[in-house]
């Protein structure tokens, strides 16, 4: 969609504008700056006065003077006439993204440039946008993942997935993570293997985040191929003009604690500046036996070269270790053991010992060059990530470890006592299933101003994504050795390999994929006072080879290359009808390549030959209206998803009842409407509400290939009857409201309510092989969630102190976040993950 320009600097009443000598008060009504923010949920912190002509709305290319370094937008007011953020040419926004303004005679700051090249602007965007700023992120960041920070946006469903810290899942408009693009500072970071996003790789980095923008539907980026439900763009802290420092502590009533410190150097001599953040999370989780120990860091160093060129180096990462709850629960188990129940652990030698333990570290480095000329702007990026980690796993040749239970927990004593067979071999082992990847790429984008409101853009993105995974024995559980069944589990058979394995030896898995992917795009955009539009097209291609040292030996370890090409066209337009009204529409068509895991769905080197590109057709229309004290937005959308390939997870514990399968040729239609509303109720009270209603259904019957769990040999093919069934895994009806009071003396209180309904369980294709069974998946009970928080901020010279407390699920509602349908499509055979009961967070931060 091209590069959108965003700025929100501050104008002081007495400041003069470069080049004209006029004051800010004189020019603000003529060419005022614009704001970008969360159009789904706007909120402001200034006072408003009816009849005042001053408005901070309009063209985005206005000169900027003054300064604004506060985390949320707080403008200087012209005496006797408080400013307003509403009017004919813009829409008020929440979580305003403020850019430090510059002094007289200077140009925009580097932060302005970074934000401008990364985010879309709500005043001219034909997309449904939601932007959350750093202040709002800090209010919500206690012990939460990135997706959970986005709660409260219509048609967006974010949960902690299983209840383990850092394990999160995100749906937008009914589409799962593999159909949501995630970008970090404008660079796509979603995996090329499955499209999945492992949010625990980025734990702790919320404290180094400047803003997060959600773009629903087609999204603005032409360098990201996966945006069907939408895209999430994370912007980390970037250079500012003044020195700031901050430290904070968060805690929860169930034992998770986090501390962090961050420093921004401000402008240093010769154009240098630096940002740094360190954080540490540790403690117990809400779910039993789910402790966490995680660190995070971020370092950003920038250098300006004259007025037009800048270079930014960023290094970030989050080495972490956390215990997990990997097994879904039944209604009976939750009724007996409670919401925090986890059946993956027990006591071993008197200590808590969890069957599922995850650890991962993904250091990530970027080097970006930004050129901001009068007519030409260019951004070049080089990035590389080295990821490695895994978790505790298990293998069995008899009774699974989770079957040794006592009072709902794993009886490790009995399991170990029974584990040694008469010949000394092990019936069960604990292993380390490790995986990693190297992800590197180069991006170059160019934009040229043609004049008369027109711009053209072009971009290239080349990347490699090389993965590996292996499993090694970690614990024989009292036995002497393990017999690896090469003859039954490996396509190569024994092949001269020793089947007797000890601690440290590899078993079951040793493979990887090497993928290269390229994207090129062209774009055209136009902007006038009332009309703006964007049009773009992209081409992309991918090539993947797989290697496997377990199923193959000698010269056969490499597969043939699986390759393909795809394309996309997307565009949109917005018309400002006057008196605060805007209407917009956008549409997109994708011919999207299969992910590399789909090409090799068998789990061996055989290429799945009948896989073709997905076809996605997206469209939406919307209406925005703003007035002196509020606004609302109404959007309708449609997404026709054709020829989808659906795969089960290959990461499956041996006692799991899930099948290993791949479905091809699946179609779905997602329709929906979204409404958001904001109203300021006087000087100190503001209210907002939202609602979304979807109609998401599968549209055809298909077939599924069933694979052997280890060798990947196809063992069967079954018909799957799902035409007309609701799409599951996210609520199709959401309603919510917030009420916030900004009280004297620095106090603030907020109450929030959300209602989720019409959520259906996900289903296994093997439970849908009866043509007479058209019963929808189990419909999860609807539920209400009520939360509240309070904070106090005091200023002490150059220091400010904020103390807060948050109450979550105040009514103690028992609700289900995710789940899998069973054979009877009711609560008797349903299994899933329940959400947290009543809990609280608290914390404090001090800023300089």
What are these regions, as identified by a protein language model?
Residues 17-44, 51-52, 58, 80-83, ...:
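Short, acidic, small-residue-rich periplasmic hinge/interaction motif at the N-terminus
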Residues 97, 637, 687, 755-766, ...:
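C-terminal beta-signal and adjacent terminal beta-strands/loops
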Residues 118-121, 126, 147-188, 204, ...:
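Extracytoplasmic beta-strand/coil segments of soluble accessory domains associated
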Residues 169, 188-216, 235, 340:
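Short acidic/polar hinge/loop motifs at secondary-structure boundaries
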Residues 218-221, 231-266, 278-288, 752:
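Short strand-turn segments of transmembrane beta-barrel domains in outer membranes
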Residues 377-383, 576, 582-588, 612-671, ...:
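Membrane-embedded beta-barrel scaffold of Gram-negative outer-membrane proteins
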Residues 437-439, 449-455, 461-463, 478-480, ...:
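Structural signature of Gram-negative outer-membrane beta-barrels, strongest in the C-terminal barrel
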Residues 527-530, 638-640, 661-766, 845:
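Gram-negative outer-membrane beta-barrel transporters
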């Amino acid at each position: 969609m091209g590069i959108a320009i965003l700025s929100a600097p501050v104008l002081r009443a007495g400041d003069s504008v470069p080049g004209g000598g006029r004051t800010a008060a004189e020019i603000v009504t003529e060419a005022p700056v614009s704001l970008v923010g969360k159009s789904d949920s706007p909120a402001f912190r200034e006072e408003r006065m009816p009849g005042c002509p001053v408005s901070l709305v309009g063209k985005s290319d206005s000169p900027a003077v003054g300064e604004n370094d506060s985390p949320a937008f707080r403008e200087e007011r012209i005496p006797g006439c408080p400013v307003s953020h509403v009017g004919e040419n813009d829409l008020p926004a929440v979580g305003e993204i403020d850019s430090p303004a510059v002094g007289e005679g200077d140009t925009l700051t580097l932060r302005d440039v970074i934000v401008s090249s990364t985010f879309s602007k709500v005043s001219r965007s034909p997309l449904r946008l939601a932007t959350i700023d750093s202040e709002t992120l800090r209010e919500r960041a206690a012990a939460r993942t990135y997706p959970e920070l986005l709660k409260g946006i219509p048609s967006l469903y974010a949960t902690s997935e299983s209840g383990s810290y850092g394990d999160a899942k995100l749906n937008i408009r009914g589409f799962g993570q593999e159909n949501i693009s995630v970008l970090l500072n404008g660079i796509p970071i979603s995996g090329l293997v499955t499209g999945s996003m492992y949010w625990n790789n980025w734990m702790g980095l919320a404290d180094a985040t400047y803003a997060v923008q959600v773009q629903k539907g087609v999204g603005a980026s032409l360098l990201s191929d996966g945006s069907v439900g939408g895209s999430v763009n994370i912007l980390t802290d970037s250079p500012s003009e003044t020195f700031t420092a901050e430290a904070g502590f968060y805690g929860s009533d169930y034992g998770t604690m986090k501390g962090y410190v961050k420093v921004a150097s401000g402008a240093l001599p010769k154009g240098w500046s630096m940002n740094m953040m360190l954080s540490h999370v540790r403690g117990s989780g809400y779910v039993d036996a789910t402790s966490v120990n995680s660190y995070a860091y971020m370092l950003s160093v920038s250098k300006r070269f004259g007025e037009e060129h800048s270079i930014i180096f960023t290094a970030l990462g989050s080495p972490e270790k956390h215990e997990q709850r990997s097994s879904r629960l039944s209604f009976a188990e939750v009724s007996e053991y409670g919401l925090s129940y986890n059946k993956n652990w027990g006591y071993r030698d008197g200590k808590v010992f969890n069957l599922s333990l995850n650890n991962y570290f993904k250091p990530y480095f970027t080097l970006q060059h930004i050129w901001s000329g009068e007519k030409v702007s260019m951004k070049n990026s080089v990035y590389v990530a080295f990821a490695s980690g895994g978790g505790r796993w298990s293998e069995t040749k008899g009774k699974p470890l989770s079957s040794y239970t006592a009072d709902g927990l794993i009886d490790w004593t009995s399991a170990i006592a029974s584990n040694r067979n008469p010949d000394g071999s092990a019936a069960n082992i604990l292993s380390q299933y490790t995986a990693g990847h190297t992800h590197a790429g180069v991006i170059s984008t160019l934009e040229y101003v043609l004049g008369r409101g027109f711009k053209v853009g072009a971009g290239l993105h080349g990347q490699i994504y090389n993965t590996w995974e292996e499993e090694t024995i970690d614990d024989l559980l009292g036995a002497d050795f393990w017999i690896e069944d090469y003859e039954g589990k490996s396509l190569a058979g024994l092949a001269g390999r020793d089947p007797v394995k000890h601690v440290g030896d590899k078993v079951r898995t040793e493979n990887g994929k090497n993928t290269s992917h390229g994207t090129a795009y062209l774009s055209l955009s136009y902007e006038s006072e009332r009309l703006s539009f964007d049009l773009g097209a992209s081409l992309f291609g991918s090539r993947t080879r797989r290697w496997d040292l377990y199923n193959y030996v000698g010269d056969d370890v490499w597969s043939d290359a699986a390759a393909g090409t795809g394309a996309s066209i997307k565009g949109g337009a917005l018309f400002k009808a006057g008196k605060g009204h805007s209407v917009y529409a956008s549409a997109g068509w994708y011919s999207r390549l299969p992910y590399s895991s789909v090409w090799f769905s068998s789990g061996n080197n055989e290429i799945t030959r009948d896989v073709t590109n997905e076809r996605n057709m997206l469209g939406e229309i919307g209406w925005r209206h703003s007035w002196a004290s509020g606004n609302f937005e109404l959007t309708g959308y449609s997404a026709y998803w054709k020829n989808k390939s659906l795969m089960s997870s290959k990461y499956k514990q041996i006692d799991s009842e899930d099948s290993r399968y791949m479905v091809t040729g699946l179609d779905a239609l997602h329709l929906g409407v979204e409404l958001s509303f904001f109203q300021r109720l006087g000087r100190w009270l503001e209210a907002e509400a939202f609602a979304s209603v979807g109609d998401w259904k599968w549209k055809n019957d298909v077939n599924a290939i069933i694979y052997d769990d280890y060798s990947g040999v196809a063992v069967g093919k079954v018909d799957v009857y799902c035409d007309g069934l609701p799409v599951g895994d996210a609520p199709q009806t959401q309603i919510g409201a917030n009420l916030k009071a900004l009280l004297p003396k620095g106090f603030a209180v907020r109450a929030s309510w959300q209602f989720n309904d019409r959520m259906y369980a996900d289903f296994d294709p093997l439970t849908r092989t009866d043509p007479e069974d058209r019963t929808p998946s189990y419909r999860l009970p609807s539920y209400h969630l009520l939360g509240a928080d309070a904070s106090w901020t005091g200023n002490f010279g150059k220091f400010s102190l904020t103390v807060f407390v948050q109450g979550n699920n105040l009514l103690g509602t028992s609700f289900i976040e995710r789940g899998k349908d069973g054979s009877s499509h009711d609560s008797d055979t349903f299994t899933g993950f329940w959400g947290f009961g009543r809990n609280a967070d608290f914390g404090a931060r001090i800023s300089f």
